Amino acid sequence: MLPSNRIAIIDSFPLPLCQPVRNHRVAIFKGLADIGYNASKHLWFYGFKVHMLVTLSGYILNYVVTPASVHDIKVVYELLEGCKRSVILGDLGYLSSELKKDLEQLGYHLWTPFRQNMAGAEEHNDWKVMAMRRTIETRFSELCRLFDVEHTLARNLAGLQLRMEQIILAHNLRYFEMN
């Protein structure tokens, strides 16, 4: 097993700005936010997507906010800028042989689960690694529960950035208190 100081986890969560019924007539962040789909919640939403890079212990290393329609793969390089961790755990949204090859050339090893119908899925999808990957889902749940991150009242980019920075700072300070 790899030492935990070499592993980081990458994932994203939706940041909706309104209820789905208002998706096509909302005016806030016009031209910046757009409509995207969240497969795990089976939900079309208007807003942004927050992509995060987190350590196994839960410390948030980096984050990027994009329009909701931006695919997870397009943000990987920006998230990994300056990352010292060499093993990156992702979900099915990062399953791409091209991305894996590109990251290996940069010195990273990307692990993503295989789809159930892919050859070798049972051997590859080790429950221990899948359990490690759940760390980021726990962090997202904490951000929602403790800081209500999915409900933003920001009405401009400066306000949104300030809110995200405050939430991440508070989360990371809380992380240091616990450890």
Regions from the language model: what does each represent?
Residues 1-179:
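Short alpha-helical elements
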